[in-house]
Amino acid sequence: MLDVKSQDISIPEAVVVLCTAPDEATAQDLAAKVLAEKLAACATLLPGATSLYYWEGKLEQEYEVQMILKTTVSHQQALIDCLKSHHPYQTPELLVLPVTHGDTDYLSWLNASLR
């Protein structure tokens, strides 16, 4: 019999979604919404990020909160749709990064948290 707990999950279903918010209150509101709807298992909010980018031909610099959201492939589109519909930015940062490896216990918790 195989010991599932000791096995590596070779291709985790987990993904990390990156999103910036203009301030901590907005980031906390967005995080609370996606957590309540079980679209993300965890939201890490990192205040103090500085973003530089061109918008409509002008160099912009904004102080933002970087949101790191942990979810699964099967929840990623609903998470992106939710963030986009409740985000104050016209074009929010919404990037999905694949998770190629992770601790089995953490990945199991992540999956269970979204059920």
Curated annotation (Swiss-Prot):
List the NCBIfam families.
PRK10645.1 (NF007930)
Functional note:
Involved in resistance toward heavy metals.
Protein name, as recorded: Divalent-cation tolerance protein CutA
A biological-process GO annotation:
response to metal ion
One of the entry's Gene Ontology molecular-function terms is: copper ion binding
> Which family, according to the similarity comment?
Belongs to the CutA family.
Q: Which cofactor does it need?
A: Cu cation
Quaternary assembly: Homotrimer.
Q: How are cofactors bound according to the entry's free-text note?
A: Binds 1 copper ion per subunit.
Q: Name one GO cellular component term.
A: cytoplasm
Q: Any coiled-coil ranges, and where?
A: none
